[in-house]
Amino acid sequence: MKCQSIKIILLVVSALLLAGCHKLEVMTKVESNGSGELQMGVGFSAEERTNLEKQNNNAQGFCNTSQAPPNVTVIEEQRSDETWCITVTPFKDLEELRSLYEQSQGIKINRLEISDGKFTYDVDVDTLSETSDFSVFTVLTWSVILPGAPIEHNADQVDANTLTWNPTPESGIINLRAESEVPRGGFSFPPCGAALIGVGAVILFFGRRK
């Protein structure tokens, strides 16, 4: 199903390129265990939508919401006179997120990991090269919802754990970097942890009696 979800994302991006639409929103939500969801939204003006519908001879199901695989949600959203097609794809770990990212040309992952109680996000996006999927955009918004409080970042905007970058179009390679805390909520200490402590105490007690 992961391949199907990737195809859905690529179809949305391909439609954007064909229609001449220049707006993209990417939002990645990462949980403390590395799972999460990736949202990619493509915005079409009323004129762009009309032209695309004429090309495809399809005035209904503009975002193809009925063709999404079970693990992918496709949402059609109206914002004033713009139509946004948004894909929501879950991922079970950071390796799956890496695979989703790498389906697009023009993105390089430097670091994407949870280690030593910290989440590190370091990604380059190419907004200039002709071979990059991101070079056609006049508006690009990239957001990451961190698993914990931000420690260090180079984002343009911060709202609690949500970081947002607004790269200048055709400005070259943009580095998106952030580091955050990772809550320990993913590990349930009792009763398992308490049991381990109990076993350790018993071993220590009997060890002293010898």
Residue ranges: model-predicted function:
Residues 24-42, 117-123:
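One face of beta-strands
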Residues 198-210:
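C-terminal membrane-anchoring or membrane-association module
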Residues 1-9:
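Bacterial N-terminal signal peptides that target proteins for export
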Residues 43-114:
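Structured domain cores in non-transmembrane regions
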Residues 18-20:
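C-terminal motif of bacterial Sec signal peptides marking the signal peptidase cleavage site
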Residues 108-184:
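Intrinsically disordered, low-complexity linkers and stems that provide flexible hinges
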Residues 33-35, 43-45, 92, 145-149:
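Solvent-exposed coil/turn segments that connect beta secondary-structure elements
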Residues 183-200:
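C-terminal cell-surface addressing/anchoring modules of secreted/extracellular proteins
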